[in-house]
Design a protein with these regions (language model features):
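Intrinsic structural disorder/low-complexity segments
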Residues: 15-18, 54, 86
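Compositionally biased, intrinsically disordered low-complexity regions
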Residues: 10-13, 63, 77, 83
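Acidic, low-complexity, intrinsically disordered interaction modules
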Residues: 22-73
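N-terminal acidic leader/helix
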Residues: 2-36
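Short intrinsically disordered terminal tails
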Residues: 1-4, 74-87
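Extended rod-forming repeat segments used as scaffolds/tethers
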Residues: 14, 25-28, 42, 79, ...
Length: 87
């Protein structure tokens, strides 16, 4: 259950990052880049609220990928770790 606006932003950030990586998998460059813009905008608002948000990004043949989400020093989602478990 969402308790405050920060929790709402966190959910939206998770959704945007998931979309970034999903559209990279689907090779949809426009949606990949739009969702990256959304993720970084949400992260910036969270920074403005005083939280440290780290969204590392790398280029995968023209598609952006975000390997993990780190908020206030805690790794919330690690896509690389989850990917290696499924291989």
């Amino acid at each position: 259950m969402k308790e405050n606006y920060f929790d709402t932003l966190k959910v939206r950030l998770f959704q945007a990052v998931d979309n970034v990586n999903r559209y990279a998998d689907e090779k949809d460059c426009n949606r990949n880049h739009v969702n990256y813009g959304s993720a970084t905008s949400i992260a910036r608002v969270m920074n403005d609220f005083g939280h440290d948000v780290d969204l590392p990004v790398w280029d995968d043949g023209g598609f952006l990928r975000i390997p993990k989400i780190v908020i206030d020093g805690k790794v919330w989602i690690d896509y690389e770790k989850n990917q290696s478990k499924s291989e």
